[in-house]
C-alpha cells in the first residue's frame, strides 16, 4: 500500500505543476477561466497534502518516525537526507499549499495580480522542495515506478 501511495503522490505532482502553470498564465493574462482552474488546483493540492501527511505520519522509511529512529531531532538536523524528509519537504510544501489556497480566494474575486504573485511564489517553493532525480541523496524518479 505504501508504494502505491508514494507513486500516487509522485504522479499527482505533475498534475499540480501543470495546473499551477496554467493558473499562473491565466492570472497574468487576466483570463476569467482562472476561477475554475484555480479550483482544480486547490482540490488537487489538498489531496496531495492529505496523501503527504498520511505518508509523513505512517511511514517508517521517511517522515515523523525518522526522528525517533535517529535518536532525536538534533541528529535529524545533522543528516541532510533526514532533514529534507522530516523538515524541509513538508514545511515548504505546506507553505506552498497555503499560498495556493490564498490565491484561490483572490482568483474567485478576480484579483489577478495578487493571485499571480502567490502562484509564482508557490511554484518556486514547490520546485525547490520536490525530490527531483538530479538531487543527490534525496532523488526520486521523474515518473513513479521508473
Where are these predicted regions, by residue range?
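Membrane-embedded alpha-helical bundles that constitute the cytochrome b-like, heme-associated redox core
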Residues: 1-146
Amino acid at each position: 500500500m505504501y508504494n502505491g501511495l508514494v507513486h500516487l503522490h509522485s504522479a499527482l505532482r505533475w498534475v499540480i505543476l501543470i495546473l499551477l502553470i496554467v493558473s499562473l498564465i491565466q492570472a497574468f493574462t487576466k483570463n476569467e477561466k482562472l476561477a475554475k482552474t484555480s479550483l482544480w488546483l486547490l482540490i488537487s493540492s489538498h489531496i496531495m497534502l492529505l496523501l503527504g501527511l498520511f505518508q509523513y505520519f505512517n511511514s517508517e522509511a521517511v517522515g515523523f518516525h525518522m526522528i525517533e529512529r535517529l535518536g532525536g531531532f538534533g541528529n535529524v538536523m545533522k543528516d541532510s537526507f533526514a532533514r529534507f524528509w522530516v523538515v524541509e519537504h513538508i514545511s515548504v510544501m505546506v507553505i506552498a499549499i497555503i499560498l495556493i489556497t490564498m490565491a484561490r480566494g483572490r482568483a474567485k474575486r478576480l484579483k489577478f495580480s495578487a493571485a499571480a504573485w502567490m502562484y509564482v511564489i508557490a511554484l518556486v517553493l514547490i520546485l525547490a522542495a520536490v525530490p527531483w532525480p538530479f538531487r543527490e541523496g534525496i532523488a526520486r524518479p521523474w515518473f513513479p515506478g521508473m
